[in-house]
Every structure is written in C-alpha cells, then in structure tokens.
Amino acid sequence: VLILSYNVYTGYRLKDKMEAVEIRVDTMSSFIKDMENDIEKAIFIVGFRSLLSLEDYMMKYDKFYGIDPEDLGITFNNAFDEVFRQGTINSVTMSLMKNNTFVYWTNKMSEQANKTNIILNFTVNSVTISQTEPWMVDIKVDLRINATDKKNAASWIIDKDFTKKINITGFVDPLYLVNNDGKVNNTIRKTPINPSASTSNLETHMVNSYYIEHN
C-alpha cells in the first residue's frame, strides 16, 4: 500500500510539474509575440526621429553627409546607424533622441520582462536604411533575442530581421538643407496632379514644388 501510494503521489507531482512548465512555456510564447510587435513599433518611432535628427544635423553644420573634406565626415548610413542606436551623430547628442534610442527601448523591454521572471537580452547585429519605393524608406534591424525563464523552464534564441517602412512625404528635401542659410525648406509632397497632362497642371506642379516619383 505504501509503495502504491508513493507511486501515485510521485505521478501527481510529475503531472503538476509538467503542467506548470507547459503553462510557463505558453506564457513566454505569448510574451515573445507581444515583444516582437513592440520591437516593430520601436523601430518605427526611433527610425522616424532618427531621420528628423539627421536633417537637424545637416542644417546645423550646413554640410552633406559624406567623408570628403567638404562633407560632414560621416556617411549617411553610418550616421543613421549611430543615431538610431545611441542618439548621437559624430558623438554629438541629438535632442530628439532623448529616451528614444533603440537601445533605450530594448532596455525598457528587458526591464518589463524581468518583472515576469524572464531574462531578456538583445544583440543588434546591424541597422540599415534603404529606399525600395519612391515614397518609402525601409529600416531593417538584424537582431538576436535571447529570452530565458529565471527557473530555466524554457528559453528562446531568435535571430530575425525586423523591417519597418517610413513614409518620407513631409520630410524636408535634403538638397534644400545645405547652402541656403535656412531660407528655403522644401518639404517632400507627392503631386496630386499629372504635370504632363497640360500646361496648367505643369505650372501648378512647379509653383507648389510638388514631387513626382521616378523609378
């Protein structure tokens, strides 16, 4: 009778433990899904502010991005990477990026994870910006995510490229940011008309400094 009772007790304990682990795995799985959505939102917010900061930096120093002597001494891609991650360009702190860098957002996510007994670590392998459509830029973050339950019930290692698109309409055309003493800032606005349809349309297009896509 004692042996039977022990076996039954052990069986129940094992079952309870397995159910607890299963619940924990489901909880972590839901957390990971929510976290991935938060990462995409963070990329959009940080990416948008990074583009504005790049404009501000150009206007402040009145130069284009590049490594030639007459340029800013940093390429556009490297400047974007730096400001996106750290909130600086050429080590100059950009005010728009205060509490809005990607590192800041991932640290906040790790803090939230810790409250639910999850150890969350991020490794940013690369940050790139490219233009694949006339009115959009793509922000791609190559990320490694390591999520581990504090009791070692479950763990995830995720290697993933996260990409968000940002519409560039409304941003200032970079060509107008340099060598004009801040007198002319032409924003990118998609033309609502066909400028080639008539002389009147062409005049309207030119007077309003509209933009037309060109592939």
Question: Which positions does each model-derived feature cover?
Answer:
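Long, compositionally biased, intrinsically disordered regions
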Residues: 5-215
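Glycine-centered recognition micro-motifs in short, flexible terminal segments and loops
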Residues: 1-2
